[in-house]
């Protein structure tokens, strides 16, 4: 007998091994029709998979998050089915699930066009309408190789060749004549795939390496039903309006170009925005007791070997050579801060010692992963490191938590989720050390009285970390700040202090950042505010515009008065109609436009308009300055 325990605690008995779908059928026809997969003893399996032992089972439907993920993965396979019918000469590569969607990488001699994407989507809809079953066959490795060799799918053969020799069989999923390999699970029938849409085509490289051949990447999204799909499309339309690349170009903030992939060219207004953020964060450093430092961009690889980055991070590092020595361009700031700490002898009474740096780092991100200024190769972090005693961890983490929340509130974020990323599989140190580090973070958050989610396997290689996830104006979540506890690196790099017994010991090292990458944070700010920044943050806070040439001198005097008060202000003296000027600066999302005619000039006043079109009337320059100063303070 096979005993199946359901989520409500009830049990069902079967005389012989039984599939997930058969269990669902025994419960009811409605559930069977809705069944996508199952979770057997916690493991996701296909609806056709057989249970041959006593087990717990949860039926997965489209109402479950796992069900939607499976729908997306199956849609990627459906892309393959449609593409191979339309363009049989192409070679299929990989088709994973990503956030809110999926993609498929394909090798094609010619780039796909928007017309191709429309044809692929139409063929997918036609295939779904056939309502066919997706068939899973667990197949010996040698036979899988034969299947793909006969079909000329050389990339599939390369992927198989990369797999461990321990893998002797794998799942093949058949969409009629099309076959793909996958761990699964997948939907049992194409009727689950109706709520999908292909979204865009881009280029990618095989294995993410620009030296390899270029692939075509087809992106799509899929949902449980049309209502969810329509809601997603509306969100994406709003996200497109807020796209930082679009706004960055419209407001002349920055640009990127092919000669410097993943590296940003900041324009005057964009750099002004950067400086506002940096100076704000510099004040956070000062107010929190951090001494600002500056460390070299390149360091001999021997230091990265000692720190552990060489073994755990070298694939993401850039290197250069000089006089037969190899140097690494720093991907992180932490080893440099340890070198600063190591200059001199420290007593336990000196701790905690806090260093902060706006440190420029470089990481060799795959070209296909680059995205505007949200994912770059060269970036600057508001990076800080605290060298402290174990007994000081809780108070330091608590203080950081309060700092981080205050910063996020100031920049307009009030929906914040907190997570703890726990030990990854590839890591330094022993379990006892990790136990201690993870317990320290839990304890500190407990003192703060906040709830958190735990993420097994997602910590840094040298320690667990607290992550701050912020929800933006259209409901997207961004991971920003981190606080990491590190018992490893101080010992590896020789950081020491003298304790109360005159013994040398290694301090605990806390790695912290509030905004993280400045580039990424500014990109998030642009999209969160749709380019309409709060007046204190805006790259240009005020534009003073004349109606005729007769007010030019007065406009310049007003501009100078505001500039002398520290405001970011420009004058628009162009020979254009005032209505044109108002429209242009409104589109530029400038918070305030001061209009000056003969009457304002005579009275030493300005007519104040906001970017939303609100007419605040006429006021003296000093009254307007008071208004702007109040917003600065806020």
From Swiss-Prot:
Residues annotated to bind Zn(2+): 334, 385, 511
Cofactor remark from the record: Binds 1 zinc ion per subunit.
Region (Catalytic): 243-534
Stated role: Catalyzes the attachment of threonine to tRNA(Thr) in a two-step reaction: L-threonine is first activated by ATP to form Thr-AMP and then transferred to the acceptor end of tRNA(Thr). Also edits incorrectly charged L-seryl-tRNA(Thr).
Every TGS domain range: 1-61
Record organism: Xanthomonas oryzae pv. oryzae (strain KACC10331 / KXO85)
Cofactor: Zn(2+)
Protein name, entry field: Threonine--tRNA ligase
HAMAP family per UniProt: Thr_tRNA_synth (MF_00184)
Keywords, ordered alphabetically: Aminoacyl-tRNA synthetase, ATP-binding, Cytoplasm, Ligase, Metal-binding, Nucleotide-binding, Protein biosynthesis, RNA-binding, tRNA-binding, Zinc
GO biological process terms on file: threonyl-tRNA aminoacylation
A GO CC term assigned to this protein in UniProt: cytosol
């Amino acid at each position: 007998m096979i005993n199946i325990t359901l989520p409500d605690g009830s049990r069902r008995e079967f005389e012989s091994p039984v599939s997930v779908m058969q269990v669902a059928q025994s419960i009811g026809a409605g559930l069977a029709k809705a069944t996508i997969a199952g979770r057997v003893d916690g493991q996701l399996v296909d609806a056709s998979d057989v249970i041959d032992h006593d087990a717990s089972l949860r039926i997965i439907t489209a109402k479950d998050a796992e069900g939607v993920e499976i729908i997306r993965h199956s849609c990627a396979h459906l892309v393959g089915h449609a593409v191979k019918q339309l363009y049989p000469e192409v070679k299929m590569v990989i088709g994973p699930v990503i956030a809110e969607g999926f993609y498929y990488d394909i090798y094609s001699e010619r780039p796909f066009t928007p017309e191709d994407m429309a044809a692929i989507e139409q063929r997918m809809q036609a295939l779904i309408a056939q309502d066919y079953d997706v068939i899973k066959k667990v197949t010996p490795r040698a036979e899988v190789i034969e299947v793909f060799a006969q079909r000329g799918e050389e990339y599939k053969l390369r992927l198989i060749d990369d797999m461990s020799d321990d893998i002797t069989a794998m799942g093949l999923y058949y969409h009629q004549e099309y076959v793909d390999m996958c761990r699964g699970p997948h939907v049992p029938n194409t009727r689950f795939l109706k709520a999908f849409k292909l979204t865009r085509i881009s280029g990618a490289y095989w294995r993410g390496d620009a030296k390899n051949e270029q692939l075509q990447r087809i992106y799509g999204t899929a949902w449980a039903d049309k209502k969810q799909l329509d809601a997603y499309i509306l969100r994406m339309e709003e996200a497109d309006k807020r796209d930082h690349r679009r706004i960055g170009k419209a407001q002349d903030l920055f640009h990127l170009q092919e000669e410097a992939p993943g590296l940003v060219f900041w324009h005057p207004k964009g750099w002004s925005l950067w400086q506002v953020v940096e100076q704000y964060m510099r004040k956070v450093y000062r107010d929190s007791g951090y001494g600002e430092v500056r460390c070299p961009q390149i360091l001999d690889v021997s230091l990265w070997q000692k720190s552990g980055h060489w073994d755990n991070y070298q694939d993401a590092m850039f290197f250069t050579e000089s006089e037969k020595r190899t140097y690494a361009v720093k991907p992180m700031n932490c080893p440099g801060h340890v070198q600063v700490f190591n200059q001199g002898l420290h007593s336990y009474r000196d701790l905690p010692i806090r260093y902060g740096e706006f440190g420029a780092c470089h990481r060799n991100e795959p070209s296909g992963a680059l995205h505007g200024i949200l994912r770059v190769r060269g970036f600057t972090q508001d990076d800080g490191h605290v060298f402290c005693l174990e007994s000081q961890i809780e108070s330091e983490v608590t203080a950081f938590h309060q700092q981080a929340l205050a910063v996020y509130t100031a920049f307009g974020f009030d929906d914040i989720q907190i997570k703890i990323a726990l030990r990854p599989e590839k890591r330094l140190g022993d379990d006892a050390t990790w136990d201690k580090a993870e317990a320290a973070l839990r304890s500190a958050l407990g003192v703060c009285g906040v709830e958190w989610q735990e993420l097994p396997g997602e910590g840094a290689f040298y320690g667990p970390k607290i992550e701050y996830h912020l929800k933006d104006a259209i409901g997207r979540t961004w991971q920003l700040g981190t606080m990491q506890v590190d018992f490893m690196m101080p010992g590896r790099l020789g950081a020491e202090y003298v304790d109360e017994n005159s013994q040398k010991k290694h301090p605990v090292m806390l790695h912290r950042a509030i905004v993280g990458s400045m580039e990424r944070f500014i990109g998030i700010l642009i999209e969160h505010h749709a380019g309409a920044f709060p007046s204190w943050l805006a790259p240009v806070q005020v534009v003073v515009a004349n109606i005729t040439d007769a007010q030019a001198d007065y406009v310049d005097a007003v501009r100078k008065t505001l500039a002398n008060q520290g405001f970011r202000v420009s004058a628009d003296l162009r020979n254009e109609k005032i209505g044109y000027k108002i429209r242009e600066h409104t589109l530029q999302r400038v918070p305030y436009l001061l209009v000056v005619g003969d009457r304002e000039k005579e009275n030493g006043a300005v007519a104040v308009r906001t970017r939303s079109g609100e007419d605040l009337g006429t006021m003296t320059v000093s009254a307007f300055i008071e208004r702007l100063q109040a917003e600065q303070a806020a």
